[in-house]
Amino acid sequence: MNAALRKWHRAVTLLPALSVYDETAQRVFTAAYDRRHKSFEDWLTAIAQLPLIEPRAVHLNQAVVTAEGAGDEIAIETLLKALMPWRKGPFSLCGVSLDCEWRSDFKYQRLLDAGFSVSGKKVLDVGTGNGYFLYRFLGSGAQCAVGVDPSWLYFAQFLALQKFFQQNRAVYLPTTLDDLSLEGFDCVLAMGVLYHRRDPLAFLAQLRNAVVCGGDLVIETLVVDGDAQTVYMPKQEYVGMHNVWFLPSIAALCRWLERLNFRIELCSEAVETTINEQRRTRWVNSFSLADFLQRAPSAPPPKRAFVIAKRL
């Protein structure tokens, strides 16, 4: 719990407006710690065994987020494997190549190619995973980058990454917006989260509350073909995920956002997810996209798109 509270206090330092939630945050993190993953202490032990590293150089503004430095590569790799599976990346940590399941740099490059900028902004990443995008935001000039995600494994992975990157302007809060309301961000992103929510409109409203008037919301999600009335709901699982509820068309997603008083700034083309972007690596001890596609060949192929909208 101390690690979570330290991250919260860092967030308040970066965003003083969050101080009004301080009492709530104390309760939220205490309750969350009581429900923590049974292996969390084991993960913390592994992280503590990582040597204190003074990186020679840190490179955040590139596909492979890199910390250059000298270290025992075998020991580093062994300890990082204790935190598997690694989903978002890639990273290079003192010579150890952390080739994660997702080439998250593909997604970020699509945003950059569309002219997306976080330079000088306070950024919130909802469903941040292990924090890969937090580092990319800082590399792109963000004033600060705060991530929320309820996964204690991802939180442990972020704590491990921070041993290498040591970025005080990157903050991870192991919680959700359901439990801890946040506000005052210039840009809020939710990438790969919307389809996990049973009430997507309520979730979009939560995101709206987190972004300042005139600020930007970025929604990146699985989509289907169709008009503004088209939404697909899987019968059970979808590409290996049991917690997938609503996959809108791009037009339907825009309609939802407009109803919530956003102005659509940009809609991307839908891009099919391939095994070049999501695949099994030696850092993932589970199935991946290629396996899931074989299980349900009749389901709509996974395609992703993003919408950038401005809060009015």
From Swiss-Prot:
UniProt KW Transferase keyword: yes
Pfam families recorded: Methyltransf_9
Chain sites annotated for binding carboxy-S-adenosyl-L-methionine: K88, W102, K107, G127, D149, P150, S151, L177, D178, M191, Y195, R304
GO biological process assignments: tRNA wobble uridine modification
Chemical reaction(s) catalysed: carboxy-S-adenosyl-L-methionine + 5-hydroxyuridine(34) in tRNA = 5-carboxymethoxyuridine(34) in tRNA + S-adenosyl-L-homocysteine + H(+)
Record has tRNA processing as a keyword: yes
EC code: 2.5.1.-
Gene3D superfamilies from the UniProt entry: Vaccinia Virus protein VP39
Transmembrane regions listed in the UniProt entry: none
Keywords carried by this UniProt record: Transferase, tRNA processing
A GO term, aspect molecular function: transferase activity, transferring alkyl or aryl (other than methyl) groups
Subunit-level organization: Homotetramer.
Functional note: Catalyzes carboxymethyl transfer from carboxy-S-adenosyl-L-methionine (Cx-SAM) to 5-hydroxyuridine (ho5U) to form 5-carboxymethoxyuridine (cmo5U) at position 34 in tRNAs.
Family under the similarity heading: Belongs to the class I-like SAM-binding methyltransferase superfamily. CmoB family.
Protein name per Swiss-Prot or TrEMBL: tRNA U34 carboxymethyltransferase
